[in-house]
């Protein structure tokens, strides 16, 4: 009896399996032992449920961190230019492929540095995707400002072209991006809860990128110009702000941040030509829910969506959970069209 009661302090699934026979009258004739075993099982189930909920919340934070990296750049470009960039997800994909190429290059040229290839891939992915973003803004998107439908169709076409280009260059199959040893394994918090090092590293990396973005937007001339153009483009131009250059640099910054998100994604899952397609819609939801151009709103919306997604999926299924989240967002936007954190100001007609 004392042993069965003592086992109730455990949170191990194996202990739960060990106690189950003691609740059966055919296996255990003593009623007091059966009652103690039932009480111990309930305690273990509560602890295991807590571990499962914490695990789902952590997975939600991990998903939210990826959505945040994708949505940060989208919030900048959409808030500044009003452009619905359907090719933004492909910046994630290009960033992930840049990480894969850096891994291959280091394996051939400098194998002693292969363990640190994600760190080398970060600036490479940022520069590549930022360059592509600035080129797209300069050559195509700039000529479509004020024409949202044409911009939507053009960026969707660019998205399809980039996907097909990657298929032609690297094949339609997923490529293997291996985690280095220092990102493998995890830390065991509870018997049924292990936090993987790669996801913890991605969370820490997202916080660094968030601080980096905040510093750029609030402590640099580019950030001041971006905020000025976002609030009143005509007035900013009258004050001497080079709006065309600001548009190009902001588009490059947003694309570069998405490229960094691609490097993070490469450490969490498969890398393939359609990688970005799975995140573009959720990224737009983050921007709309958080408030256009609002950094704090994007953070709250990204982590909130990620946690709700991961908690609802086991309970209701992936499809029904997604539908419920969409309905909740629609109802919220009807009450607050400007999102969680709207810009405060007065409009003069």
Q: Model-found features: residue ranges?
A:
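Structural detector for internal amphipathic alpha-helices that build alpha-solenoid repeat scaffolds
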Residues: 1-12, 21, 32-45
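Amphipathic alpha-helical scaffolding segments comprising HEAT/armadillo-like alpha-solenoid repeats
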Residues: 12-24, 47-52
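Membrane-embedded helix boundary and interhelical linker motif in transport proteins
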Residues: 88-135, 315
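Alpha-helical transmembrane segments within multi-pass membrane transporters and channels
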Residues: 112-159, 165, 300-305, 336-337
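Cytosolic-side transmembrane-helix boundaries in multi-pass membrane proteins
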Residues: 144, 150, 154, 169, ...
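Helix-loop-helix "hairpin" substructures at the membrane interface of multi-pass membrane proteins
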Residues: 194-271, 300
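Inter-helical junctions in multi-pass inner-membrane proteins, predominant
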Residues: 216-217, 221, 247-287, 293, ...
